[in-house]
Amino acid sequence: MSMSDPIADMLTRIRNAQMVEKVSVAMPSSKVKVAIAQVLKDEGYIDDFAVKTEGAKAELNIALKYYAGRPVIERLERVSKPGLRVYRGRNEIPQVMNGLGVAIVSTPKGVMTDRKARATGVGGEVICYVA
């Protein structure tokens, strides 16, 4: 059976792994998932990630991050879904928790944070909120 929303699956795997305090989580890899993982790493929400390729299948391993025994990611919420895509122009990109969190946006210039998209002057599809 094919998966209807692989990005939502990725976010759910991260959320579930952090609830049971796993050190890392593995999932099927794709270019968009790797780009999202890179943004999460750059913003300090995860420790590291690696893509392991075996034959035709690639697996994305994400090392989760904790602070004082609690997960660094408190909120991980999918915004744009396959049934209802959410696009925002460069002046309409939302702030998460008044700038304390991050909105991950897929733009023509790649996947980036809301702050970088505003600074670059591009809009795009709001993938998720992270706080």
Swiss-Prot record:
Pfam families: Ribosomal_S8 (PF00410). Keywords: Ribonucleoprotein, Ribosomal protein, RNA-binding, rRNA-binding. GO terms for cellular component: ribonucleoprotein complex; ribosome. GO terms for biological process: translation. GO terms for molecular function: rRNA binding; structural constituent of ribosome. It comes from the Bacteria. Part of the 30S ribosomal subunit. Contacts proteins S5 and S12. One of the primary rRNA binding proteins, it binds directly to 16S rRNA central domain where it helps coordinate assembly of the platform of the 30S subunit. Belongs to the universal ribosomal protein uS8 family. This is Small ribosomal subunit protein uS8.
